[in-house]
């Protein structure tokens, strides 16, 4: 059974620390990390300094930058780390610092949310879950192992609560992302479609996991990024680079305004095409991480999924509705899949839903 927190859940300790960070005149207050969230907080809170052990810069927005060992032990620290939030929290706890993170600050602060930088891929989740509980339950019941169900529950509890306590146990494990040894079988002469290849950062893992690969299609809308990938992997004749976005239909030479009118996601591409149009051979594996355009790309791969029954590794962290609409789309096209869920990062990013063909055992 899906074991979720009550929707009125509050982390009382974090709430109290956020209030102290906002309103205390006696507590020393520091922000750990320098990014857009740091600047957002500084507009509303008078702080005593910024912590960054790795910068040579001595100040930011007229505030001194300190090493962690220079900070008073009774200080309250707000971490803005997005890449390793659990590692940072555990390190601060070990050193004895009271600490909170930006998600707690965003949730419990009484500052108008429109005045704060919005954390990505999470603020739409609570309302969507409330309105579509039945759909989430359906997906939970489709998951094929207990590990998937545990991950499903933990990540949803986190997204509802903004509380990193629910993410304890997750680590940054990018090498296994898309290639989970528990799920993905060995495939000889694989044809691999890398949707959202960026600068080719997944290519080394494809080659490592499938050294006798037949073909890799790298599809990336950003011209600069795909040119970097081409340069880095130019020695491979069987890697093809395609400079376009993926969607549910072919659209050419779109202006920025047309993009806004046609796309309900952040996948900005002047030219969009479908997987069915682009690939004219059997595809064994499709990976998609394309900034919220995954639903459209799957619709545009209808024939490929129906006829090839490729393994699918699809990122579902960009939009709340991806959690249930992506499995709906895939199973409507081809019901002969087992569904699994894995999460490969300490924080918000890198939740992957796997669709493994029933006949893959």
Predicted region positions:
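Phosphate/nucleotide-binding beta-alpha loop and adjacent structural elements of enzyme active sites
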Residues: 1-47, 53-75, 79-361
């Amino acid at each position: 059974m899906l074991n979720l927190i009550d929707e009125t859940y509050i982390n009382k300790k974090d709430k109290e620390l956020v209030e102290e960070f906002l309103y205390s005149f006696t507590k020393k207050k520091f922000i750990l990390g320098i990014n857009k969230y740091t600047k957002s907080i500084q507009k509303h809170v008078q702080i005593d300094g910024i912590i960054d052990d790795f910068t040579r810069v001595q100040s930011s927005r007229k505030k001194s930058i300190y090493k962690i060992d220079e900070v008073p032990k009774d200080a309250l620290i707000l971490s803005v780390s997005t890449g390793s939030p659990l590692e940072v929290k555990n390190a601060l706890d070990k050193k004895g610092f009271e600490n909170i993170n930006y998600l707690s600050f965003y949730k419990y602060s009484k500052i108008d949310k429109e005045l704060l930088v919005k954390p990505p891929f999470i603020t739409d989740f609570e309302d969507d879950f409330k309105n579509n509980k039945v759909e989430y339950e359906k997906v939970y019941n489709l998951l094929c192992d207990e590990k998937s169900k545990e991950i499903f529950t933990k990540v949803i509890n986190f997204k509802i609560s903004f509380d990193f306590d629910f993410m304890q146990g997750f680590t940054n494990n990018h090498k296994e992302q898309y290639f989970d040894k528990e799920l993905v079988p060995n495939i000889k002469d694989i044809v691999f479609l890398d949707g959202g290849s960026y600068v080719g950062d997944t290519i080394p893992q494809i080659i490592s996991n499938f050294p006798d690969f037949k073909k890799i299609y790298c599809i990336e809308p950003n011209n600069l990024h795909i040119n970097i990938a081409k340069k880095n992997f130019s020695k491979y004749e069987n890697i093809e680079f395609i400079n376009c976005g993926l969607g549910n239909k072919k659209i050419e030479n779109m202006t920025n305004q047309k993009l806004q009118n046609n796309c309900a996601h952040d996948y900005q591409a002047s030219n969009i095409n479908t997987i069915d149009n682009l690939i004219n051979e059997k595809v064994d594996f499709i990976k998609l991480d394309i900034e919220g355009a995954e639903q459209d790309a799957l619709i545009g791969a209808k024939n490929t999924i129906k006829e090839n029954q490729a393994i699918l590794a699809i990122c579902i962290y960009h939009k709340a509705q991806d959690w249930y609409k992506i499995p709906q789309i895939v199973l409507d096209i081809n019901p002969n899949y087992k569904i699994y869920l894995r999460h490969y990062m300490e924080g918000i990013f890198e939740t992957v839903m796997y669709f493994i063909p029933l006949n893959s055992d």
